[in-house]
Curated annotation (Swiss-Prot):
HAMAP family: HflD_protein. Belongs to the HflD family. Residues 91-125 form a coiled coil. PANTHER family: HIGH FREQUENCY LYSOGENIZATION PROTEIN HFLD. It comes from the Bacteria. One of its GO terms (cellular component) is plasma membrane. InterPro entries: HflD, HflD-like_sf. It is found in: Cytoplasm; Cell inner membrane. Keywords: Cell inner membrane, Cell membrane, Coiled coil, Cytoplasm, Membrane. NCBIfam families: PRK00218.1-2, PRK00218.1-4, PRK00218.1-5. The gene is hflD. This is High frequency lysogenization protein HflD homolog.
Amino acid sequence: MAKNYYDITLAMAGISQTARLVQQLAHEGQCDREAFHTSLSSLLQMDPPSTLAVFGGEERNLKMGLETLMGVLNANNKGLAAELTRYTISLMVLERKLNANKQAMNQLGERLGQLERQLAHFDLESDTIISALAGIYVDVVSPLGPRIQVTGSPAILQNPQVQAKVRAALLAGIRAAVLWQQVGGSRLQLMFSRNRLFKQAQNIVAHC
């Protein structure tokens, strides 16, 4: 069956967007607010009608992720680009471990379901919800291993609010990696279909 590279690229951009958010948070203590909102919102999309619907139905919501993906595909993998590649691959590895663990998958679904009730009282980007998302990552995803080593400013990374946002972003990255697998993504494409992914991302960015 022919691969749908549009959907694969969108899902891949979802992973890249969370990798970039983690990088921004770790180095600067803050991140692009709109991109963060898109990534967090994707965690609530349990039964989306399309790949794009997971990210709010607008290609522009993934602009940062698409640009990050293009940078990673085109880079020599040094410095910050190497960091982004490492986060991306680590999320893909963790997703495979999650997928193989039915108990963890069920627990993740239950915890995200409970979160919807909290959202009746709190904003998605409130400290309460971000802490809850971070807690889900620590309780459900982290034990599956290996741990994702986040690098950045040690002083910034000691801040509990930054730590919570990083973990919430990583959880959204796992969501995007699950989607990526569902639409036919595979790590082999990063080696053998780089040009195709790059051109597809370029085409989408052109009308963002």
